Amino acid sequence: MTFNRRTFIGTAVAATSTLAAPMVNAAGHGKPRVVVVGGGAGGATAARYIAKDSNGEIDVTLIEPSRQYYTCFFSNLYLGGFREMNSLGHSYGNLAAAYGINVVHYWAVGVDNDAKMVALAGGGMVPYDRLILSPGIDFVEGSVAGWDLSAQNAMPHAYKAGSQTELLKAQIMAMPEGGTFGMVAPPISYRCPPGPYERVSMVAHLLKEINPTAKILIADPKEKFSKQGLFEEGWQNHYGGMIERIGPDFGANNTSVDP
């Protein structure tokens, strides 16, 4: 059987809700309850369409600690000066107002599969009949020797959009004349293969305007990357010799940094 959105909703509507809601009250205790953990693009979209397509027949709870979500997609356009930061931000008010979703701003710290409960950092418990876990992507600790999350303010990653993106742009704007912007590209596999090279392109666009003698150095452990021919053609046409990429043949697969 194909498990699509319609199938999921039909299955959830057929479920019998027998658990109480001691900490987070659902609007209708007799309805099946779906809990979504994670309010990024995936989780928020799932919560929205379950609530919308069920026509109120399913109680939907979205657990997300942040009150504002900034998309990583399009954040490169902010770095390049094509978008404002506030255009990347999304609150959760419309999910509650338009679709009746119960938005809970806490960290989810555990799941009890037997009791069908999600534990919250504040000690609360959220009951469910169906559970969707959409926590998003995260860093692989130790993937770049010498760097961990404690160094993110000195050497921002900006792959989780928000304050990190703003910090990275501020550091780019403050680069000395003729300075060097360095980026360690990730090895395969990772989300959005063209993303690092789109970022380089936008940083180059900004530097061409404010610091045209600056250089960009990419340490790339991959022998080739997504849309490489198009990127390299565009870099040469628009930015001349500003961008240099070092591949594994020159040791980029054994990179370390010192924040």
Where are these regions (language model features)?
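Core beta-strand elements of the Rossmann-like FAD/NAD(P) dinucleotide-binding domain
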Residues: 122-130
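Glycine-rich dinucleotide-binding loop and its adjacent helix/turn
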Residues: 135-210
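Beta1-alpha1 glycine-rich phosphate/pyrophosphate-binding loop at the start
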Residues: 27-102, 187-229
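N-terminal secretory signal peptides and thylakoid transit peptides that target proteins
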Residues: 1-15
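A Rossmann-like FAD-binding core segment of flavoenzymes
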Residues: 98, 102-110, 118, 126, ...
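Short, well-ordered coil/turn residues at beta-beta hairpins
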Residues: 11, 134-135
